């Protein structure tokens, strides 16, 4: 009779996932600090990365060390930002954002993933026009819709989207207004459950059958690469069982 994964096996998998998430956050903190300085009060990108670290139970000491390495107070690795674009099976557009200390390694890994899963890499700008860059502040069900909407508009948000299926609400902003809107909402006691600057597709593409399997395989493979920070696509997530 077969047995499921052991408790130790599940714990090891959970620890590995947590370690990968921490690595991504540390890299983002490092790049943000190098680009905009080590003071999160004057560096919205750094503050966003640190907020993500705190919500993931990362210690402040770990984050401070990452900042000091980036600002030259401690010796550390320098990472650069690179973005790759391409197509998954079914014409699904994919954007892959990376932070790397070895561009040659990273592009080889990303290209291998596309090739292995039946996709192909494109040139810069080949799919980015299908997406919008925007800030998203997500609020769980239970928050007063009118109060949040009024506060968001006053703070400079572009739109407020309510999801009737679960009552969740997203506040959408221009990227350069993200920090301003977030700070204004938090100051009034409206703390988002999640906040980030991201890409959203203008239109989703539905896939099914073997194509859906291959698209999911590619997205998962890209997400698992050490140098990959974020993966965006215009696939209809419902088609992937998400």
From Swiss-Prot:
What's the domain of life for this entry? Bacteria
| GO-annotated cellular components | cytosol
Q: Where are the transmembrane segments?
A: none
Gene3D superfamilies on file = 1.10.10.200, 3.30.70.980
Print the keywords alphabetically: Cytoplasm, DNA-binding, Transcription, Transcription regulation
Q: Which GO terms describe its biological process?
A: regulation of DNA-templated transcription
- Main location per the UniProt record: cytoplasm
Which GO molecular-function terms appear in the entry?
DNA binding
Q: Which InterPro entries match?
A: Integrase-like_N, TACO1_YebC-like_2nd/3rd_dom, TACO1_YebC_N, Transcrip_reg_TACO1-like, Transcrip_reg_TACO1-like_dom3, YebC-like
Q: Looking at the Swiss-Prot or TrEMBL record, what is one Pfam family this protein matches?
A: TACO1_YebC_N
Instruction: Please state where this protein is localized.
Output: Cytoplasm
Q: List the disulfide bonds.
A: none
Q: What NCBIfam families does this protein map onto?
A: PRK00110.1, PRK12378.1, YebC/PmpR family DNA-binding transcriptional regulator
Q: Which family does it belong to?
A: Belongs to the TACO1 family.
- Give the protein name, as stated in the record: Probable transcriptional regulatory protein XAC3151
């Amino acid at each position: 009779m077969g047995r499921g994964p052991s408790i130790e096996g599940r714990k090891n998998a959970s620890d590995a996932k947590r370690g990968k998430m921490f690595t991504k956050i540390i890299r983002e903190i490092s790049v943000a600090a190098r680009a905009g300085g080590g003071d999160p009060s004057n560096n919205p990108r750094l503050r966003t990365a640190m907020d993500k670290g705190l919500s993931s139970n990362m210690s402040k000491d770990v984050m401070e060390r990452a900042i000091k390495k980036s600002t030259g107070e401690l010796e550390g690795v320098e990472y650069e930002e690179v973005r790759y674009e391409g197509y998954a099976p079914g014409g699904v557009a994919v954007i892959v954002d990376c932070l790397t200390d070895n561009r040659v390694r990273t592009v080889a890994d990303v290209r291998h993933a596309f090739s292995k899963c039946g996709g192909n890499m494109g040139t810069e700008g080949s799919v980015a026009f299908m997406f919008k860059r925007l800030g998203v502040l997500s609020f769980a069900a239970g928050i007063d819709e009118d109060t949040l909407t009024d506060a968001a508009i006053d703070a400079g948000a572009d739109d407020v989207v309510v999801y009737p299926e679960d009552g969740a609400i997203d506040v959408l902003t221009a990227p350069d207004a993200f920090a301003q809107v977030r700070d204004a909402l938090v100051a009034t006691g409206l703390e988002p459950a999640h906040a980030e600057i991201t890409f959203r597709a203008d239109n989703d593409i539905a896939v099914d059958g073997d194509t859906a399997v291959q698209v999911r395989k590619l997205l998962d493979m890209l997400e698992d690469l050490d140098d990959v920070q974020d993966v965006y696509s215009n696939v209809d997530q419902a088609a992937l069982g998400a």
